[in-house]
Regions:
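A short hydrophobic beta-strand segment most commonly corresponding to one strand
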Residues: 1-18, 22-24, 142-159
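Short beta-strand His + acidic residue motifs that chelate non-heme Fe in jelly-roll/DSBH
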Residues: 1-4, 10-11, 94-95, 112-114, ...
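Conserved hydrophobic/aromatic beta-strand scaffold that supports enzyme active sites
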Residues: 2, 58, 83-85, 102, ...
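C-terminal amphipathic alpha-helical segment
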Residues: 9-91, 97
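Glycine- and acidic-residue-biased ligand/ion/polar-headgroup-sensing regions
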Residues: 87-116, 123
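Residues that cap or initiate secondary-structure elements
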Residues: 92, 109, 118, 135, ...
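Active/binding-pocket-proximal capping segment
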Residues: 104, 127-129, 144, 152-153
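Short acidic-glycine-tyrosine-enriched beta hairpin
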Residues: 114-135
């Protein structure tokens, strides 16, 4: 799964995307081809150097017999993009702290139950949780893993 921070820049090498011819401004965000090359580092790194410099190591924030909550990307500094991973073993209620976020099911299947509906979930399902949704219940069939992305200070969900 690739999750892109809204502040990230994307330079496109291809001249066509979904049958549409892209202008140079669309491909290089208006900075031009030559300046785009300056955005990249051409210094070679070993696998260990690359891992130490750029890989985020998950940190266990909370764990009990029902669920494990890991910080994948903390969302620091304040109000920046954050990612957590939730691994469910049993039925668990979570509180969303009045903030919208998205969820992606990465492993397992089950149900998500809110005050007004119940939805079956499978790997690859993307979910939008609006800020007005105070609480939801995750009911896994076996083990279920979900990535949650949000922009509020971590932790932006609470395990109940």
């Amino acid at each position: 799964i690739e999750i892109q921070d809204p502040a990230d820049f994307t330079f496109r090498a291809e001249k066509h995307c979904f049958g549409i011819n892209l202008s140079e401004a669309q491909r290089y965000l208006g900075v031009g081809f030559e300046n785009t090359l300056d955005a990249f580092s051409y210094q070679g790194l070993t696998k260990e150097e690359l891992t130490n410099k750029y890989y985020f190591k998950p940190e266990i924030y909370f764990e009990n017999n029902y669920v494990k909550q890991e910080i994948m990307l903390s969302g620091k500094p304040k109000h920046s993009f954050g990612i957590i991973k939730l691994s469910f073993k049993e039925k668990t209620k979570i509180e969303l702290n009045d903030e919208f976020c998205i969820g992606i099911i990465i492993k397992g299947k089950g149900e998500i139950k809110t005050i007004s509906q119940q939805t079956h979930i499978l790997p690859g399902n993307g979910l939008f949780f609006p800020a007005v949704l105070d609480e939801l219940e995750v009911i896994p069939e076996g083990k279920l893993e979900m990535i949650i992305c949000g922009i509020k200070d971590f932790p932006y969900i609470k395990i109940k």
